[in-house]
Amino acid sequence: MASLIAEDLQYSYSKQSQSVLKEVSIQLTPGTLTALVGPNGAGKSTLLRLLQGQHIPNNGQITVDGNPLIISRDQVALMPQRGVLNWSFPITVEGLVSLGRVSHSRSTCCELEAALQRVGISDLARRRLDTLSGGQQQRALLAKTLMRPASIFLLDEPCSSLDPPTREQFLIIIRQLADAGLTLFVSSHDWGQALNAYDKVIVLDKTVLASGSPHEVQKRLDSISCMGNHCCD
């Protein structure tokens, strides 16, 4: 299992544009379920893409078990937001999950079955994507991500469009993955969910405002709010 460290990351989409991220430093450890929380436009999706190697930071460095990300990128897998896929495309669950792999090879079939079992949708393998509920589609997308030979998994807003019962089921699944020793980093705009379901919380708004256990982060944010309102004068 692998850990990831990002130090002093800065990123802008062009030399003329303002920085999307400024001096961002985080650490992700195996067996830990970490939430990345922040408002829309805080840079959450951009940070996940940096950590997966899709973007290159203007400054700072990212290492996986002490090695530069550029030589350890296979250790990091990103599950994009559900909206990036065309769910009306005529493909089955097993077709999506095994997409890009050698079809019908013994290893692919075994990995496919293992991924579907881990997210609890083995019985849906031959169902078309457009017949699934939102929660089932999210599980299929997670299963596809788990097909990557990685131990660090970045999930971009996986619960944003799910109803409360389905959200709870999905959180149970990713908790089990973390308990199995994987490194899970999950972006969310749901502060209540982050406080109740995660081991660690990182609050981002272009830079890291707070990081630690849910209790520690809550105290830190209360302190910031208190200072902003001059309640300690």
Regions found by a protein language model. Give the residues of each.
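Helix-to-loop junction immediately C-terminal to a conserved catalytic motif
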Residues: 52
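Conserved ABC transporter NBD signature motif
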Residues: 60-73
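Conserved ABC ATPase "signature" region
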Residues: 109-124
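Conserved ABC ATPase signature
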Residues: 128-132
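Catalytic Walker B motif of ABC-type/P-loop ATPase nucleotide-binding domains
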Residues: 153-156
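H-loop/switch region of ABC-family ATPase nucleotide-binding domains
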Residues: 188-189
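H-loop (His-switch) and adjacent beta-strand-loop-beta switch element
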Residues: 200-213
